[in-house]
Regions:
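General detector of N-terminal leader/presequence modules that precede the first folded domain
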Residues: 4-61
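Generic alpha-helical secondary structure signal
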Residues: 54, 65, 115-117
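Sequence context surrounding c-type heme c attachment/ligation sites in exported
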Residues: 6-30, 72-148
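Short, structured beta-strand/loop micro-motifs enriched in basic residues and often containing a Trp
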Residues: 57-72
């Protein structure tokens, strides 16, 4: 018999996420789309990582920032308070990619709109994938919160 460990999301589900203002909207193209080579690397990697959602059709998205994250995100200083920080809302897929902070360090989670943890539903939803991109693109991401 084989057993595995399901770690789940590190960031908690942000119960009031729908009240956070949308700071940016766009779309992740479907898997059949050609990605422009002129886009920033983090955008291309995000598209490649999540173009499978909604049966390969991609998804519209909204970026939402909590009230406590707006100042540090705008200042790009990395001084996020503990708690909920940001959500990338995949509207067509009804999925939330969540960033929160604990002791100044980013925590990541993936949830359905209903709060169900989806971090084990696909390899690209694992926390280590979030951490790799969010820490690997310092031109776009500061302390785990990325901007366009």
């Amino acid at each position: 018999m084989s057993t595995g460990v399901f770690a789940g999301s590190d960031a908690p589900f942000p119960k009031d996420w729908q009240t956070w203002p949308v700071t940016h909207s766009g779309a992740i193209p479907g898997s059949a789309s050609v990605i422009s080579p002129d886009l920033p690397t983090i955008v291309k990697e995000t598209f490649k990582t999540y173009n499978w959602v909604a049966d390969g059709k991609g998804s519209a998205y909204n970026v939402r920032l909590s009230a406590q994250a707006k100042g540090p995100a705008a200042a790009r200083n990395g001084k996020f308070a503990d708690g909920d920080s940001a959500v990338l809302e995949l509207t067509d897929a009804k999925v939330l990619l969540v960033t929160s902070h604990l002791l100044g360090e980013p925590q990541y989670g993936v949830y359905g709109y209903d709060g169900k943890d989806l971090s084990g539903a696909h390899p690209s939803l694992a926390g280590k994938v979030c951490n790799t991109c969010h820490s690997g693109y310092s031109e776009a991401c500061v302390a785990g919160v990325c901007s366009k």
